[in-house]
Amino acid sequence: MSGYGLPISQEVAKELAENARKIAAPGKGILAADESTGTIKKRFDSIGVENTEANRAFYRDLLFSTKGLGQYISGAILFEETLYQKSPSGVPMVDLLKAEGIIPGIKVDKGLETLPLTDDEKATMGLDGLSERCKKYYEAGARFAKWRAVLSIDPAKGKPTNLSITEVAHGLARYAAICQANRLVPIVEPEILTDGSHDITVCAEVTERVLAAVFKALNDHHVLLEGALLKPNMVTHGSDCPKPASHEEIAFYTVRSLKRTVPPALPGVMFLSGGQSEEDASLNLNEMNKMGPHPFQLSFSYGRALQASCLKAWKGVPENKAKAQQVLMERARANGEAQLGKYGGGAGGALAASSLFEKRYVY
């Protein structure tokens, strides 16, 4: 029939679905370690460490060689440099992950640029040459990919506009189709920034508009939902809202918005932390899973909310490696328990309760 796309082979569809299910396994989630060179410079600056390739390799080796990490981490998103990088002892980073049973993934977008004739609304770059890059990434050991799109809320200015939502949905769908054609599970990330003074009900309404558009576009582009994953924001109040929402409210509105818009064929929803403190990111996820069962796994794909305390424990000092790995394991365990709705709170103490919010966050 006309109007239908060419199906991917049963072999590829099976591989995609199996890998997506493995990544969304109960009690596990994703370590997002795909910071660009510029972003990791900001992280290193905060602890007084020079942003050299050697220091980046040491730090990522610290993360990926943590014994037992695979108990709670199913996948790790890498920056392109890291996919081809070796540890200080000469072991490929990909092999460190595989030794723990962790599936390597790759950030494939090329960052954001402003949509012309808009009030600073963003489009994501990187579709040019993506198919060829995906082939190379698969050969290097990657089995999933991530593409970040960004939207902002400003009711007074009508943001996000329909143009912004359409652009985000179209870009994510094209990316996802290209990935699946090249045997990579696409993680679809439409991040609605928390900047603003709006309350949680506004975020819920915008999240539903965005996700409805994204899944319509994925359908239009013949994307196999069983072989894809979603990385959305949680539904929260704006960062400047005078009346912050509780963990229970965040869980209620987030789950409601997902059930209204996300097809149950999708294996998993892997939340971004969006500048929440490490502890809030765990507690909010825990509250959602206490409300289960859900049509899909609700899990995590955290960067700052897994690494912040670990980075501070390391401080760029080689002798602190074991201590930093212990801190990482503590945070990974907390989130693994939260995925099961069994996190009791308190991991990491006061340090884990510190906000990680950055205005107009650029990854």
From Swiss-Prot:
Name listed for the protein in its UniProt record: Fructose-bisphosphate aldolase 1
Record keyword Chaperone present: no
Entry superkingdom: Eukaryota
Consequence when changing D34A: Abolishes enzymatic activity. Reduces ACT1 binding. Slightly reduces MIC2 binding
pH dependence of activity: Optimum pH is 6.0-8.0.
Gene, per the UniProt record: ald-1
Database matches in CDD domains: FBP_aldolase_I_a
Residues involved in beta-D-fructose 1,6-bisphosphate binding: R43, S273, G274, G275, S301, R304
Record: residues binding D-glyceraldehyde 3-phosphate: S36, T39, K107, E189
Described purpose of this protein according to its UniProt entry: Plays a key role in glycolysis by catalyzing the cleavage of fructose 1,6-bisphosphate into dihydroxyacetone phosphate and glyceraldehyde 3-phosphate. Forms a bridge between cell surface adhesins and the actin cytoskeleton. Required for parasite invasion of host cells.
Annotated phenotype, changing K42A: Does not affect enzymatic activity. Reduces ACT1 binding. Reduces MIC2 binding. Abolishes enzymatic activity and reduces MIC2 binding
UniProt EC number: 4.1.2.13
Record's subunit section: Homotetramer. Component of a complex, at least composed of ald-1, microneme protein MIC2 and ACT1. Interacts with microneme protein MIC2 (via cytoplasmic tail). Interacts with ACT1 (F-actin).
Effect upon mutating K231A: Abolishes enzymatic activity. Reduces MIC2 binding
Pfam families membership: Glycolytic (PF00274)
Chief location of this protein within or outside the cell: cytoplasm
InterPro entries in alphabetical order: Aldolase_I_AS (IPR029768), Aldolase_TIM (IPR013785), FBA_I (IPR000741)
Reaction equation(s) it catalyzes: beta-D-fructose 1,6-bisphosphate = D-glyceraldehyde 3-phosphate + dihydroxyacetone phosphate
Effect of K107A: Abolishes enzymatic activity. Reduces MIC2 binding
Variant or mutagenesis effect after changing Q307G: Does not affect enzymatic activity. Does not affect MIC2 binding
Coiled-coil parts of chain: none
